[in-house]
Swiss-Prot record:
Record-listed ATP binding positions: 251
Keywords: Aminoacyl-tRNA synthetase, ATP-binding, Cytoplasm, Ligase, Nucleotide-binding, Protein biosynthesis, RNA-binding
Sequence motif 'HIGH' region, residues: 54-63
Molecular function, one GO term: ATP binding
Cellular compartment(s): Cytoplasm
Protein name: Tyrosine--tRNA ligase
EC numbers: 6.1.1.1
Chain positions of motif 'KMSKS' region: 248-252
Top-level lineage group: Bacteria
Originating species: Synechococcus sp. (strain CC9902)
Length: 415
């Protein structure tokens, strides 16, 4: 992560990967510190935009980094403008994609959006919610169909006229696909312009995004200038590495920790995070200082897992999860080293639970595995497996987790 900006408050600096522009310190269009100072002098909060396309139904910890920063702005007295991309989700963000996304129906997007808001804490007290839905004036939830769905053809053509094909092909994802001969649909070029126009529609002062979103965030600033509006700052945060320690956290890769994972499952997964990722997890997912972590690598893992789980579920639930994880393998403290390992190398993924149990040798056959699961004897990291057909996407999703049969049989799965 880059060096902190001494002119900005510590809560804003924390975890920041990039801030642009970062020009003349006294210019409110070039310096976020100057914009903050001017807003305070005028007695007005900044409008901080975060756009999300509800293309799935679950939020994981990798997504939560941006929501945590948005909440920090709320707690500092600013307005969080959460844009639900119910229109743009029907196109699909081409960022990071090697092929055109499958377009979603309007109904699919609406269902996903409702699920997202629930997970963000729409029905929770602000003390436990990821975003503050309670404090008046701190949150606007906007749907970009408000301003995009009614655009007529002249308006769309005018928007297209603000960008060039050269600009779009300079975007790495488009460039790679073009150079490899992979088709790029024309509507995909429209996506960055539509997302950028969201910033015009809501008069954003700041837009949050991952480091992979810099092109789209910069497009918003360009369009604000084109339409004669005040221009936003782009504040980018790192992409969280997944449980495999190699690639970004992604449901497709099976290396995620879900926001709705129960405390024991969340703690048990986090306890296996590799040494190189621990500091980033602490910085991006908690308010704990990295310097406060134990030096011992194993104790450091456990401290991180406890802190992250507590951030989501509270300190009592996290402490119980840590205790339960220690007792999971039949002894007090950390007995995890005594659990026999079972390799996943011979397992064909995606793998259903009944097949997995027979493939790693914890059950003699698939039929026995089905019986054991239906009888309530099978657990993964202490959480009961209830469906024999529960599917696991990859070895990375299971690496380091403990598969249990009954009270005495355990296997630590290794990729």
């Amino acid at each position: 992560m880059p060096e902190t900006n001494p002119s900005l408050p510590s809560w804003l600096n924390r975890g920041m990967a990039d801030l642009f522009p970062a020009g003349e310190p006294s210019d409110v269009d070039q310096s976020l510190a100057a914009r903050l100072a001017a807003a305070e002098a005028e007695g007005r909060p900044l409008r901080v935009k975060l756009g999300i396309d509800p293309t799935g139904s679950n939020i994981h910890l990798g997504h939560s980094i941006l929501f945590r920063k948005l909440r920090a702005f709320q707690d500092a007295g600013h307005i969080a403008v959460l844009i639900i991309g119910d229109f743009t989700a029907r196109i699909g963000d081409p960022t990071g994609k090697s092929a055109t996304r499958v377009q979603l129906s309007k109904n699919d997007v609406a269902v996903n959006a409702s699920t997202y808001l629930r997970q963000l804490g729409q029905d929770q007290p602000k003390e436990t919610a990821l975003l503050d839905f309670e404090t008046p004036g701190r949150l606007e939830v906007r749907y970009n169909s408000e301003w995009l769905e009614g655009m007529d053809l002249p308006a769309v053509i005018g928007l297209l006229g603000t960008g060039t094909v050269g600009q779009m092909l300079a975007k790495e994802d488009f460039s790679n696909r073009y150079n490899s001969g992979t088709p790029i649909a024309l509507h995909e070029f429209l996506y960055p312009l539509l997302q950028g126009y969201d910033s015009v529609a809501v008069n954003a002062d700041v837009e949050l995004g991952g480091t992979d979103q810099k092109f789209n965030v910069a497009m918003g600033r360009d369009l604000q200038r084109h339409f004669g509006r005040g221009t936003q700052f782009g504040l980018l945060l790192p992409i969280l590495v997944g449980l495999d320690g190699a690639q970004k956290m992604s449901k497709t890769l099976g290396n995620t920790v879900g926001l709705e994972d129960d405390p024991l499952s969340m703690y048990s997964k986090l306890e296996k995070v590799g040494d190189t990722a621990i500091n980033d997890y602490v910085t991006l997912l908690t308010d704990l200082n990295v310097e406060a972590l134990p030096e011992n690598p194993r104790e450091k893992q456990k401290a991180m897992a406890l802190a992250v789980t507590a951030t989501r579920h509270g300190t009592d639930a996290a402490a119980k999860a840590q205790l339960d994880a220690g007792n999971l393998v039949g002894g007090a403290g950390d007995a995890s080293a005594d659990v026999p390992e079972a390799s996943l190398l011979a397992v064909n993924f995606p793998a259903k639970a009944f097949y997995l149990m027979s493939a790693v040798g914890i059950c003699a056959s698939s039929s026995e595995a089905r019986r054991q699961i239906k009888g309530g004897a099978a657990r993964l990291d202490g959480e009961k497996i209830t469906d024999p057909n529960q599917e696991f996407a990859s070895a990375a999703e299971l690496d380091g987790r403990v598969l249990q049969l009954g009270k005495k049989t355990f296997r630590r799965l290794t990729a």
